[in-house]
Amino acid sequence: MSILSLVEDRPTPKEVYNWRIYLLAAVASFTSCMIGYDSAFIGTTISLQSFKDEFNWDAMSTDKQNLISANIVSLYQAGAFFGAFFAYPMGHFWGRRWGLFVAALVFTLGAGLMLGANGDRGLGLIYGGRVLAGLGVGAGSNITPIYISELAPPAIRGRLVGVYELGWQIGGLVGFWICFGVDDTLAPSHKQWIIPFAVQLIPSGLLLLGILFVRESPRWLFLRGRREQAIQNLCWIRQLPVDHIYMIEEIGAIDQSLEQQRSTIGLGFTKPFLAVWSNKRIMYRLFLGSMLFLWQNGSGINAINYYSPTVFKSIGLRGANTSLLTTGIFGVVKTVVTFVWLLWLIDRLGRRLLLMIGAAGGSVCLWIVGAYIKVAKPTERDPDAPLDGGGIAAMFFFYLWTVFYTPSWNGTPWVMNSEMFDPNVRSLAQACAAGSNWLWNFLISRFTPQMFAKMEYGVYFFFASLMILSIVFVFFLIPETKGIPLESMDGLFEYKPIWRAHAKVLAQLREDEERFRTDIEESGYTKSDAQQVERVEQAESVPKA
């Protein structure tokens, strides 16, 4: 087997890798389009001269400008932090499907509220709208990865959850180029800066429409005791009959996992809270998941996403249009590399190796960019002077950092957090993981303007140092999860050393699979047997007169 081969825990029929599973993942990932667009458009929009003129920006002190910029950006993260936790009761009681619908609805209300802002009304509507939009995307960032991971076959689970990350990058790409387009084609006016705010309504509207046609997660239906509908949905998604041996295995694994959860943690709404506080194993995994998002945000990605014009100015680029163009190219690079990660890397190269390679390469690039700024002091040069050779090299290493970071730390923490928890604590665990992402996101975005003002080149050294530390964390604490069924994740955290756990669990799964199929063959199992059992079960379920 090559290092770039798909890892299957058992023989998987080709019907399982069908268009339906990709369509469901794509519709759910309009959530991440909302997030990506918001993270990309806001920093560039508030840098437009038309926005500054509308709100009398130039009359403010530099400190006040930095404070308002930070507030506009960080209120969104604050809302997202709380939205991630509000999503837990929605996902538990209403399901993944309707939870996503409510998240999109709240986001749409927030986006609509922002459209009422102008110079006379002030920034209050933008502040309020950003909080509501944050609540919506925070809830969506909790539910979407869970929904997709619960639908996905193990061998392509990383790829399918990666569609969520792809949606993020497509939304970001649109956000970057919308701002470049309005700056390049429209005269400074209210219309120029309000258009990027209005475009937020497109991905949320598509999600509101699309969610009406998707299927509920079978695993959530099993959890809620709606077994018949769960089996029906699972068969529809897999495109296999209920008596196929693959379906028998999967349903049996889900039943076994739920029975284990019922006898240990319990299946109620409050049971996961008790389990988290009383079970060190679950608490430890929550720590790992939250730390992955600390290292992700510690790479500097959100400082760049939200304040890209400031970042490029620190390297020596001048002019709003030039910064917007460079930011747009940054978005293109991220999107292209995300496709590579999605199609070839995440389920073939695996999670651990990607994280370590990305951190090592990205750290080197940031050290070089920071060293250039320290030595050359590009911000002190003539604003009309073109980039010199050192500046061009710094831009090259910035984009090379993007190539290292994007297929490693951008989406992989979301994939791992969606798959490494037991079914009954998965919603709560994902809420904690998503909440931690938005907490670190908030802290970075809130203080980035002040960091660039005070630290200058030191900002790049700071993020480069954190990327080095993340390598040590991943090597010693994070197991590989590719190709492992959700119901078998516990084993990964029981074997030591952690870097050998994946091979041991996979070998055990294949041994169990071979034994199961041998037992099935020796029992003389046929499809007609399964159909007869199903008919008997249906007959027994009919009420007697």
Curated annotation (Swiss-Prot):
Q: Name one GO biological process term.
A: quinate metabolic process
| Flavoprotein listed as a keyword | no
Q: Which regions face the Extracellular side of the membrane?
A: 44-66, 119-130, 181-193, 307-325, 374-384, 479-545
Q: What is its main location?
A: membrane
Question: According to Swiss-Prot or TrEMBL, what is its membrane topology?
Answer: Multi-pass membrane protein
Record-level GO cellular component terms: plasma membrane
Provide the transmembrane region boundaries. 23-43, 67-87, 98-118, 131-151, 160-180, 194-214, 286-306, 326-346, 353-373, 385-405, 458-478
Segments for region (Disordered):
520-545
User: Mind listing the UniProt keywords for this protein, alphabetically?
Assistant: Cell membrane, Membrane, Quinate metabolism, Transmembrane, Transmembrane helix, Transport, Ubl conjugation
Question: What the entry says about post-translational processing?
Answer: Ubiquitinated. Deubiquitinated by creB, probably to control its activity or amount.
Topological domain spans for side Cytoplasmic: 1-22, 88-97, 152-159, 215-285, 347-352, 406-457
User: What molecular functions are annotated in GO for this chain?
Assistant: carbohydrate:proton symporter activity
Q: Where in the cell is it found?
A: Cell membrane
Please verify whether the record's keywords include Nuclease: no
- State the family it belongs to: Belongs to the major facilitator superfamily. Sugar transporter (TC 2.A.1.1) family.
Oligomeric state and partners? Interacts with creB.
What is known about what this protein does? Integral membrane transporter that imports quinic acid to be catabolized as a carbon source.
Q: Which PANTHER family match?
A: MAJOR FACILITATOR SUPERFAMILY (MFS) PROFILE DOMAIN-CONTAINING PROTEIN-RELATED (PTHR48022:SF34), PLASTIDIC GLUCOSE TRANSPORTER 4 (PTHR48022)
What name is this protein filed under?
A: Probable quinate permease
